Amino acid sequence: VLLFSLISLYFSFKYLEKLKLKYLFINFFIFFLALLAKENTITFLAIIPLSAYFFSNYKARNILISIIPLILASVVFLIIRQSIIGTTPEKLEDELMNNPFLGMNFTEKFTTIFYTLVVYLRLMIFPHPLTIDYYPYHIPLVKLTDLRGIFSFLIYLGLSVFIIRNFKKKSIFVYSLLLFIITLSIASNILFPIGVFMNERFIFISSLGFSLAFIYFLIEIMPKIIKNKKVYQATFLSMMMIVFLLYSVKTISRNRAWESSFKLFTN
């Protein structure tokens, strides 16, 4: 999914650079393949023009033209999906395993959703503990008066203010945040229920935004903080080694859980 989405982003920029129709036709098929791989790709309808805005000075008209094949590919995909799958039976929404928010009122539902969005941020920084299944109430019900809910709202309110205030500056951190939020939005339960509170795999594409912000901080921001070149290089290498070692240990330890179906569902 991510591979095809990034290839589509590449061909969008190729069109904007060359203004040749062949890139629009190629992009239609690439984006359609990405949608067939996973429908989360549809969030790149926003990411691609956003990327053009942040990293180029192309005309708005040409940017809009560049996403026409993406829109057409999305329409074709949705028509095919609807004809094969149809709509979800309403009775599924009355089953806890398909609707983890069953029995919650409006404020409880959205406070819990914002809490899960903060959990996603935490997992980006500190991916422990991990699980294959966030079954109903694995994530606790969070009420509006719960400090966890208040804290979650304040975090995303602060991020929203930061995005609004720095959007015109084309800040890399703003782009990274938007990449994280937009690609996660389709699996956030805000737009529509997806049947689970959350899942770690839902932030695979979103992790691109986190990685971009982290690397930008190390390469562009940290040298301005640490003026001494040798100290900066030592700090940079130390931080990269820490990340490499800790994440490698976590990856290897999680691999053991995937040895068999039995181990997977008992870990």
Residue ranges and their predicted role:
Residues 1-267:
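Polytopic membrane enzymes that build or remodel cell-surface glycoconjugates and lipids
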